[in-house]
From Swiss-Prot:
Gene Ontology MF term list: protein folding chaperone; unfolded protein binding
Native species: Trichormus variabilis (strain ATCC 29413 / PCC 7937) (Anabaena variabilis)
This protein's record includes keyword Ligase: no
Function: Redox regulated molecular chaperone. Protects both thermally unfolding and oxidatively damaged proteins from irreversible aggregation. Plays an important role in the bacterial defense system toward oxidative stress.
Record-annotated disulphide pairs: 239-241, 272-275
One of the GO biological process terms: protein refolding
Protein family according to the UniProt entry: Belongs to the HSP33 family.
Protein name according to UniProt: 33 kDa chaperonin
HAMAP family named in the record: HslO
Length: 301
């Protein structure tokens, strides 16, 4: 099944639902960063959460940054997701592995530890909106749901899941169901929805059982006036890094540092944290940067 995002509404627009399948892009992240099992689960959940949050943004080019900063051995997570369906991300310690937790599951909470969740929404106007909440469990789903309730005042049910087998990621994705203000006062509706979400065994078991996103929506909201939007959105792992950006970053180091790199290393190597791509800048590239800096200095002087 292709990685995709599907939107739906129910209760005359009082309930908003978004589902994502992110199996392939999570596997790509695992391969790019050579992630351990628990690191794959942690990053995969956070990427799915980022895509779900970005889906509610309106302006083209809007993006959301999700940073999980905990005191656990994973050493943090950073994800950048866009309304356009692209996502990228990395963890601080990609090779960490822990024993299963008390439920026999990958111990994402133990890997993340205690700390904070930072969310920055950039809608393209130059004034990003940022918010911080304390981590509830470190399991990502609980933490993002807590953010949505406390920072956006929107009652939300969030399910995230990643299943990693011996051959890689076989199922990944998430589901976000939000009760909007027009329906939040209907206590019976909210209770009914909470009961149904709570009865689910998890998101990845549904995918492994062959359930599609529309079928999951029907199981949850089929008798609540469900409307599924016919257009699905393709999701993919994508990083906007480039050699030109690397040269721009190297140029900011200044003439003396660049000259030192030429003498000691005969060039420079840079690795993109988000996608793991390695860039090589030769001594000729660095020499040209020095020439550019000298030219700019003489012009400005």
């Amino acid at each position: 099944m292709a990685d995709q995002l599907i939107r739906a509404t129910a209760a005359d627009g009082g309930i908003r639902a978004v589902g994502v399948i992110t199996t392939r892009l999570t596997e790509e992240a695992r391969q790019r960063h050579k992630l351990s099992y628990v690191a794959t689960a942690a990053l995969g959940r956070t990427m799915a959460a980022g895509l779900l949050m970005a889906s509610s943004m309106k302006r083209a080019g809007s993006r959301v940054n999700v940073r999980v900063k905990g005191d656990g051995p994973l050493a943090g997570i950073l994800v950048d997701a866009g309304l356009d369906g692209t996502v990228r991300g990395y963890v601080g310690n990609p090779h960490i592995e822990l024993p299963p937790n008390a439920r026999g599951k990958l111990d994402v909470g133990g890997a993340v530890g205690n700390g904070y969740l930072y969310v920055v929404r950039d809608i393209g106007y130059g004034y990003p909106y940022s918010s911080t909440v304390e981590l509830v469990s470190g399991e990502i789903g609980d933490d993002v749901a807590h953010y949505l309730v406390t920072s956006e005042q929107t009652p939300s049910a969030l399910m995230l899941g990643v299943f990693v087998g011996a051959g890689g990621v076989t199922a990944a994705g998430g589901l976000l169901v939000q009760v909007l203000p027009k329906a939040a006062r209907d206590e019976a509706l909210v209770a009914k929805l909470e009961s149904r979400v709570g009865a689910l065994s998890g998101f990845t078991p549904l995918l492994q059982a062959g359930k599609t996103l529309p079928e999951i929506f029907h199981d949850l909201l089929g008798d609540m006036g469900l409307t599924i939007f016919p257009e699905s959105q393709i999701l993919r792992f994508h990083c906007g890094c480039s050699f030109d950006r690397v040269l721009g970053a190297l140029k900011m180091l200044g003439e003396a540092e660049l000259q030192d790199m030429i003498v000691k290393d005969d060039g420079a190597e840079a690795t993109c944290d988000f996608c793991g791509r390695v860039y090589q800048a030769s001594s000729e590239h660095l020499t040209q940067l020095i020439v550019d800096l000298q030219t700019e200095s003489s012009v400005s002087g």
